[in-house]
Amino acid sequence: MRLGNLGAATWPLLALTLAGCVSTRPEPPPAPVTRAKTQATREASPAGDAPRALVPPGLRLDSRVKPVRQAVTLELDPRQETFRGTADIELALFADEPLRELWLHGDELTVEAATLEVNGRKVAVSALPVGEHIALVPEEPVGKGSASLHLEYTGRALANEDTGVFRAEEDGRWYAMTQFEALYARRAFPCFDEPGFKIPWQLTLRVRAEDGAYSNAPVEHEDVGADGWKTVRFKPTPPLPSYLVAFAVGPFDVVDAGRAGRNGVPVRMLVAHGHAAEATWAARVTPPLLEKLEAWFDSPYPFAKLDVLAVPGGPGGAMEHPGLITFGAQSMLGPVEGDSVWRQRMFAETQAHELAHQWFGNLVTMEWWDDLWLNESFADWLAFKVINQWQPGWRWDVRRVESRGQAMEADQLVSARSIRQPIQSSGDINGAFDGITYGKGAAVLAMFESWLGPDAFQLGVRRYLQAHARGSATTKDFFRALSIVVDRDVAPAFSTFLDQPGVPLVSVELQCPKDGPPRLALSQRRYLPLGSPGGQDGTPWQVPICARYTAGGAEGRACTVLSEPTGTLVLDGAKACPEQVHPNADGRGYYHALLAGDGLERLARQGGKGLSVPERRVLMDDAQALVASGDLDVAQALTLATKLLRPEDPDLVEAAVGVVGSVRDEFVPDALLPHRARFVRGLFGPMARRLGFVSRPGESEDLRMLRPSLVWLVANVGQDAVLRAEARKLALRWLEDRSVLSPDAASAVLGTAASGGDAALHQRLLQALRATRNERERELLIGALGAFRDPALSRASLELMLAPDVDAREALPILFNQLSEPPTRVGAFGFLREHFEPLRQRLPRDVSMWLLASGGFFCDAEHRQQAADFLGPRAEQLEGGERALAQALERVDLCIAQRKALRPGLERFLAHY
């Protein structure tokens, strides 16, 4: 699963305060669940018994009662909030002693009738709701054997939610969809809502005759009645956990994408009425990606069909349901002409991720949520590989390194999770969908794949999947399969990265003794940025380390595993003392590297000669991190970025932009802001002005992707008067004619114009917002409205979050855009304090958790305390809220410490400009 975005400009800001990825691109960290922390009880009183309290079983259901298969029939009209359903569940009872109650999940459902048959005998039963559970209390205790349960119930499909069964309206037409991962199948039907319960499902949907009905499996039978309704029965599915069940109802257009894969499965795109042409890219890329994955697994796609559905109004994200993958419409659909390059590439990456899940997660499912990494880490890791094979010109090996850096940004926190975090609450389950599980997990897999060898690693994965196909598995099962193939126990080394949080900091010092070959003296400790409350009390990692070096004009490579606090790597192949050493060959190691002595100076002197783009990118990422930890002077990091920069390489320019842009405004004294602007203009100005805001015919896709970040930095941080004036003119032209700017550039233009904009521009943007229903235009306009710095105008923009004609979800970027900028931060947080409760009520329950992130944007003790005082009591009421707030406040502490430590070095560096 990839969760949705709030707009390209917002996620980097929100990511600074959540445990997800930090990026200049829309790669969101999933949010924890928002749920009051309550433990419900209920009294039961079977005939002849005194009333007794019913206490639900907690996180995991009673293992003595297991489902065997389940059939669900739903009567669903997307125009209506209420739906009706029946659930028929075959059960196996394993109790040694008779059971007085049977438990299953059911949330916000009203059970109207229940019948139970045990070993062929009917037993009177009461069905009582208790929190997120349903207690089945039989008239008399029931023992071992087989049972069948029939439940009739009603539920709700809400229009302001995006989990469970939810509804959306577009152009007067209504659609109903589902999102059950992680804990929301229980809102659609009573069930055993845990990943380890993997059973066949058969769904039947009774819908209006004019609506289409879709689910995981192909249609078995369809019957149209004289009453204007039809009944659509789907074939039984292979064994699936409840979170992978899915269905959709509505007047969808169907785009035939042909047949794909070894079995020639039918591939279709399902889109809201009138949007078929916008699915062209999705239909084009899905079949070849499926075939690339089949080749890697040497196994056919394991399901009977492949529908890909664009959720109307959905801003982003995706879910891997077998046979019915879902995407937010903004992620999946794009105009036939003038589409965003970044949207196309991110759709392809996300689709590769979701298709990889058909094996990782769907064919073989984790036994319990603490092994979520077996789903998400593997899908992210393989998506990078497959995209790089399919489109090598995209250089997704650089994107992999970027993702690694984003994961490390989250993993530096003392409050960060480990990849395999013990699950103690439902908040822990939902909190596991974060940058640690996705990004760190993928980076760790890439590191161990490189250490063990790609071919052996691939064979180990195939062995694991073959052994557990159509079933469930654990991390131990994966380790066992991989260890057999490589003939060594991989568990100890792997576990040091899976079972503890943090990033190793490996110090590397080149030593060239006269009486032996050159060597690298290695030491490791936990990376901790300045201001961190953490200590060095963890278990040493077993770090696979590969170094690349140049000695006497010849290149060499040496590898080892650093298992102790210190170690040595002998460079046997070096015939002389190396001119340079890169401590992380190919950028595949999950560690920050500190080049001791003159190691960094050697690399800088060589200007990165002979280094690949991923290796240069890793050096820049490490330099940023070492500045934050106090191990490298900020001037050294900025100088290194200039030395490694190749103006002709957009990926390296983007990396250097990230290094320079990472210096927060709060770190720079007001008197030196003009100096910083001159430094930025001097380094990037010529490139930015040549590139401009407007795409040129024949321009490469890489330049189109670079434009927003490069030109925005020079125009705003560099205060380039020419670019700012151009942005104002182009913004006004864009308001008249959307074709004057590519989608990739429009955000930077509108944001730059708005940052210095007046009331007239604000009014024009507001009018344009209210005049369009085009989701992409609205995203751009809302992003611009969040960029105004004038207090009155920024306040007017914030009030859109409460406007009845604006969806609070789409307006939320305004809040985070303003929180990210010092001039508007205090006002934005004040607005949130005034309107926290109405905002929370207007947002979906999961999304409202993100409001806790607002406290993480400050960089001073006074406002940190205000955030803690205001948000603390609210976080206590939400599952996962305390961890989310702790991470936000920890980031404030880091910023305060780094501001104090880095200012002197910045002052010295910027004084020269």
Enumerate the predicted regions with their spans:
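N-terminal, polar/Ser/Thr-rich
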Residues: 21-84, 171-175, 195, 491
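Hydrophobic alpha-helical and helix-loop surface patches within well-folded domains
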Residues: 25-39, 234, 262-533, 662, ...
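Extended, low-hydrophobicity, Ser/Thr/Pro/Gly-biased non-transmembrane segments
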Residues: 150-256, 279-281, 591, 613-621
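Surface-exposed beta-strand/loop patches in extracellular or lumenal glycoproteins
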Residues: 88-108, 202-208, 523-546
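Bacterial N-terminal signal peptides
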Residues: 9-20
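Beta-strand-rich binding/interaction modules
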Residues: 112-117, 490-491, 501-584
